[in-house]
């Protein structure tokens, strides 16, 4: 019984992500992403303001949401692959 309990504990530890890491898209392609470094807790997506289609021109990880510029609108989120 103790062996079974120990096995379950080990399997649980191995399967759990002990240190949560955020995953963000980092290219214009939606199926490519990277794990963000420690301290970067937001994903962002930049789109062109004047372009009718909201195609992302830049994606990545950030510690703070970048400010909008004259050309780019930034949207930030904090869940895996949300950008």
Swiss-Prot record:
Residues 1-21 form the signal peptide. One of its GO terms (biological process) is killing of cells of another organism. One of its GO terms (cellular component) is extracellular region. It is found in: Secreted; Target cell membrane. Its main location: secreted. Coiled coil: none annotated. Keywords: Cytolysis, Disulfide bond, Hemolysis, Membrane, Secreted, Signal, Target cell membrane, Target membrane, Toxin. Disulfide bonds join 24-43, 36-61, 65-76, 77-82. Expressed by the venom gland. GO terms for molecular function: toxin activity. It comes from the Eukaryota. Pfam families: Toxin_cobra-type. InterPro entries: Cytotoxin_Cobra, Snake_3FTx, Snake_toxin-like_sf, Snake_toxin_con_site, Toxin_cobra-type. Belongs to the three-finger toxin family. Short-chain subfamily. Orphan group XV sub-subfamily. Has low cytotoxic activity. This is Cardiotoxin 7''. It comes from Naja atra (Chinese cobra).
């Amino acid at each position: 019984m103790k062996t079974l309990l120990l096995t379950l504990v080990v399997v649980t530890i191995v399967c759990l992500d002990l240190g949560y890491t955020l995953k963000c898209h980092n290219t214009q392609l939606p199926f490519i992403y990277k794990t963000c470094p420690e301290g970067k807790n937001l994903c962002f997506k930049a789109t062109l303001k004047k372009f009718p289609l909201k195609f992302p021109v830049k994606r990545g990880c950030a510690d703070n949401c970048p400010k909008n510029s004259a050309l780019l609108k930034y949207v930030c989120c904090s869940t895996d692959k949300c950008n």
